[in-house]
A protein has these predicted regions:
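Short beta-strand scaffold segments in enzyme catalytic cores
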Residues: 2-6
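Metal- or metallocofactor-binding catalytic centers and their adjacent structured scaffolds
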Residues: 7-84
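Conserved, mostly hydrophobic/aromatic
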Residues: 11, 34, 72, 85, ...
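Ligand-binding pocket scaffold of soluble enzyme catalytic domains
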Residues: 15, 83, 101, 122, ...
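Shared catalytic-loop signature of beta/alpha-barrel
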Residues: 34, 48, 217, 223-226, ...
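N-terminal amphipathic alpha-helix/helix-capping segment at the start of soluble metabolic enzymes
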Residues: 53, 86-100
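Short beta-strand/loop segments at the ligand-binding rim of alpha/beta enzyme cores
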Residues: 95, 101, 192-202, 241-251, ...
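Metal-dependent enolase-superfamily TIM-barrel catalytic cores that perform enediolate-based chemistry
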Residues: 99, 104-238
Length: 318
């Protein structure tokens, strides 16, 4: 995890978290390059300043440039809140909610043999371990979990062909073996977590429309909380949504109002996911307001560090 610290002339600081993983190498250098246009400016006028920085990076819209802007925006808003001695959520209109529902994200993914050693935990190597993990989720106080696709073959691993990491790329069309293994995995989680726990499934970018239809139809009877599906065509996502009963969550990889609007207009998802470290908390609030106009609820995307968790919590509170 990486952090940006801004210091105003009076010594007030603002801090944000950003991440160079998952397609964002070199982000620190971009932040440093963009910040040269912000030096000496009024940090309280963050909307004006971010509009200027957006204009200066207009021809490199999205991607790493947007993540750099978001890191700066988040630090500016934090600086303003510290200067006024108020929580960030007060700058967003005050707390609408004081308690937030949480789910255990990427449940089991980091306990597969490849990464379990780094966390000093027992590796998950079979379905019995999944059952035990489901019990641990509930005993830890969580009412929901989100998981990925695991294959328990000779070397248990996470199946993620959409990231060119495993078999199935570039066709992005799951085999019967994958569909059956995924069903067994979800049933094992249900056995361990019990009938009342919500189970969410992250399928982001792993398939094309044909593949998503085959997977979601095969699992639609399991009563999952949502299928999480990221792809970049609103019409394709809307087709998938119309084809199943399970809610669809999406859009964690989008940037800004212009990125989200086509998906809202296509009625492509039931839950819109917003990444605060990627969009900036002020812009995220705008996206949430746009979602509300289309009667769509919002959830944060947060699989980073503890500061990002706090940033997302302030966003959700508002």
């Amino acid at each position: 995890f990486s952090f940006l610290k801004l210091i105003a002339e009076d010594g007030t600081t603002g801090i944000s978290e950003y991440n160079e993983s998952y397609g964002s190498p070199g982000l620190t250098g971009v932040i440093e390059g963009v910040l040269k246009w912000a030096l000496g400016k009024n940090p309280f006028a963050h909307e004006r300043l971010m509009s200027e920085l957006y204009a200066r990076t207009r021809q490199a819209h999205g991607g790493i440039a947007q993540q750099a802007l978001a890191a700066i925006e988040n630090a500016l808003v934090d600086l303003k809140a510290r200067s006024l001695n108020v929580p960030v959520y007060e700058l967003l209109g005050g707390a609408v909610r004081e308690r937030l529902n949480l789910y255990w994200s990427h449940c089991g993914s980091y306990r597969l043999p490849r990464t379990a050693g780094f966390l000093s935990v027992e590796p998950v190597v079979n379905l019995d371990d999944i059952v035990s993990l489901g019990r641990e989720v509930v005993s830890s106080g969580f009412s929901a979990l989100k998981t990925n696709i695991f294959l328990f073959d000779d070397e248990p691993h996470m199946h993620q062909p959409g990231f060119a990491g495993t078999e199935g790329w570039p066709e992005l069309n799951p085999s019967r073996k994958v569909r059956e293994a995924l069903r067994e995995q979800l049933l094992a989680f249900r056995e361990g977590a019990g009938p009342d726990a919500m189970i969410l499934l992250d399928l982001n970018f792993n398939y094309k429309t044909e593949g998503y239809l085959s997977v979601t139809r095969a699992l639609d009877d399991l009563g999952l909380g949502w299928f999480e599906i990221d792809l970049y065509d609103p019409a394709a996502l809307a087709l998938i949504r119309r084809s199943v009963k399970t809610p669809i969550a999406s859009c964690e990889s989008l940037f800004g109002l212009r990125g989200y609007r086509p998906f809202f207009e296509a009625q492509a998802m039931d839950v819109s996911i917003v990444d605060v470290p990627w969009n900036g908390i002020w812009q995220s609030l705008k996206i949430a307001s746009l979602a509300e106009s289309f009667e769509v609820n919002v959830a944060p995307h947060n699989f980073y560090g503890h500061l990002s968790t706090l940033m997302s919590a302030h966003f959700c509170a508002a």
